[in-house]
Curated annotation (Swiss-Prot):
HAMAP family to which the protein is assigned, alphabetical: Glycerol_kin
Gene assigned in the entry: glpK
Positions bound to ADP: T13, R17, T266, G309, G410, N414
Reported function: Key enzyme in the regulation of glycerol uptake and metabolism. Catalyzes the phosphorylation of glycerol to yield sn-glycerol 3-phosphate.
Native organism: Koribacter versatilis (strain Ellin345)
Name assigned to this protein: Glycerol kinase
UniProt binding sites for sn-glycerol 3-phosphate: T13, R83, E84, Y135, D244
Key words, A-Z: ATP-binding, Glycerol metabolism, Kinase, Nucleotide-binding, Transferase
Entry-linked InterPro entries: ATPase_NBD, Carb_kinase_FGGY, Carb_kinase_FGGY_CS, FGGY_C, FGGY_N, Glycerol_kin
The protein's annotated pathway: Polyol metabolism; glycerol degradation via glycerol kinase pathway; sn-glycerol 3-phosphate from glycerol: step 1/1
Length: 498
């Protein structure tokens, strides 16, 4: 007998997670497993698709076990995933032809420059809502076709399949019966027309990608099929798909135009719901599909920062300044301010609203009085400064001041960060008590599809406990700090440009 539980698979950049939710949106169990980050060259980031699959299926089974549930009890599986990351596999063997090229990967920066120089940027933005950048999937697929032996010939014979991580997981869950994605993930590929909600033939010709490689595009909330594997999840309906940031927007109940959220993950991602209108940007954000439920497509403005919480990983694993995230928090709180130090974590370039793929990281303002605490504090504050830059750009595009910013993600547990975020923006920051909003958003989408909830309005009215951080800093002090941040930003731009 199916019970009112949703199993959400949350496949992220550094770990695979599975969360069981009940009908009230309460977490009943969580399982998580990190997987290998592969760095073959400077600026290259890869994952092993088979390891992604193995880690995801293992945590799914573990989460059910912890909740004392069997597959027959689960109403539906929901899938949310790191977006833009490109997987290409052989339909006949089911094996990837190359590692997944991760959204952070910059190997195609030169190719993207060629597209811009040839005058394609306006056309691409009009069709996709995106800027030409190696961040998005299209150029990654082109690289695989051009650089993996026999890949192009196999693709032209219809042997190869491309998908974002959701497509790969669903292919594996259904033993190759379904090759699908949803509109939110498709809109991140640089191959998808967000106005017609179809793959764009002119874009495919521009990037020389055969249409036969592409998954079928479906809505974000429907029963797509059932699990076909015998790994403990058999026969569960697969009923909701959304890219991680769109899922987070839905999980934060930002279901009305004008509402916005920011996720502090490996990167930072701010989205604002713009309703059924795809709002064009003049401030180097991107226009993206938020979700499709039934026949209604909703859109969002988005700004993406490449390095957010990952700056803490760098201090831990790269500089070895701390041994754990808890130790980082203590170090950052050991000083009252940044001591004039600014960290710009442009390790893989700068995302929105700057879009400088040749920027590189820097630390500025160091004196003999600088301590490790100041560096840690500056690293923490760098996350907030980047988010403030996104907020400014978003408000310029919409012309509407944001009344509050809803937040989630791992670093949202850091109250020092959230208070500084409110201070530097001059806007209240609101954190829900349950920060699993990405998985929750996907669970809501799946639950609507199988009838646990009737529509988004019901979900928007569900009670949410939250903590609110009001701005305390004076505007003059905030402006002075922002000025120094902007000065540091200007130093790192174009660092590696030829």
């Amino acid at each position: 007998m199916r019970l009112p539980y949703i199993l959400a698979l949350d496949q992220g950049t550094t770990s695979s997670r599975a969360i069981v939710f009940d009908q009230d949106g309460v977490v009943r169990s969580v399982a998580q497993r990190e997987f290998t980050q592969i760095f073959p060259q400077a600026g290259w980031v890869e994952h092993d698709p088979e390891e992604i699959w193995a880690s995801q299926i293992s945590v799914a089974v573990e989460a059910l076990s912890r909740a004392e549930l069997r597959s027959r009890h689960v109403a539906a599986i929901a899938i949310t995933n790191q977006r833009e990351t490109a997987v290409v596999w052989d339909r006949e063997t089911g094996r990837p032809v190359y590692n997944a090229i991760v959204w952070q990967d910059r190997r195609t920066a030169g190719f993207c420059d060629q597209l811009k120089a040839a005058g394609h940027e306006e056309f691409v933005q009009q069709r996709t809502g995106l800027l030409i950048d190696s961040y998005f999937s299209g150029s990654k697929v082109r690289w695989i076709l051009d650089n993996v032996p026999q890949a192009r010939s196999l693709a032209e014979r219809g042997r190869l399949a491309f998908g974002t991580v959701d497509s790969w997981l669903i292919w594996k869950l259904t033993s190759g019966k379904l090759h699908i994605t949803d509109v939110s993930n498709a809109s991140r590929t640089m191959l998808f027309n967000i106005h017609t909600c179809q793959w764009d033939e002119e874009l495919l010709r521009l990037l020389e990608i055969p249409a036969s490689m592409l998954p079928e595009v479906r809505s974000s909330s429907e029963v797509y099929g059932t699990v076909q594997t015998s790994l403990g999840l058999e026969s569960i309906p697969i009923a909701g798909i959304a890219g991680d940031q769109q899922a987070s927007l839905f999980g934060q109940r930002c279901t009305s135009p004008g509402m916005a959220k920011n996720t502090y993950g490996t990167g930072c991602f701010m989205l604002q719901n713009t309703g059924e209108r795809a709002v064009p940007t003049s401030n180097r954000l991107v226009t993206t599909v938020a979700w499709k439920i039934g026949d209604v497509v909703e859109y969002a403005l988005e700004g993406s920062v490449f390095i957010g919480g990952a700056v803490v990983q760098w201090l831990r694993d790269g500089l070895r300044l701390v041994r754990s995230s808890g130790e980082f928090q203590e170090l950052a709180n050991s000083v009252k301010d940044n001591g004039g130090v600014y960290v710009v974590p442009a390790f893989v370039g700068l995302g929105a609203p700057h879009w400088d793929q040749y920027a590189r990281g820097g630390i500025f303002g160091i004196t003999r009085g600088t301590t490790d605490g100041h560096v840690a504090r500056a690293a923490l504050e760098s996350i907030a400064y980047q988010v403030a830059d996104l907020l400014d750009a978003m408000q310029r595009d919409t012309g509407v001041p944001l009344p509050e910013l809803r937040v989630d993600g791992g670093a949202a547990a850091n109250e020092t960060l959230l208070q500084f975020q409110a201070d530097i923006m001059g806007v209240p920051v609101v954190r829900p008590s349950v920060t699993e909003t990405t998985a929750l958003g996907a669970a809501f989408l799946a639950g609507i599809a199988v009838g646990l909830w009737s529509d988004p309005q019901v979900i928007a009215k569900m009670p949410v406990e939250q903590k609110r951080f009001e701005p305390r800093m004076g505007s003059a002090e905030a402006l002075a700090l922002r000025h120094q941040w902007e000065k540091a930003l200007s130093r790192v731009k174009g660092w590696e440009e030829a």
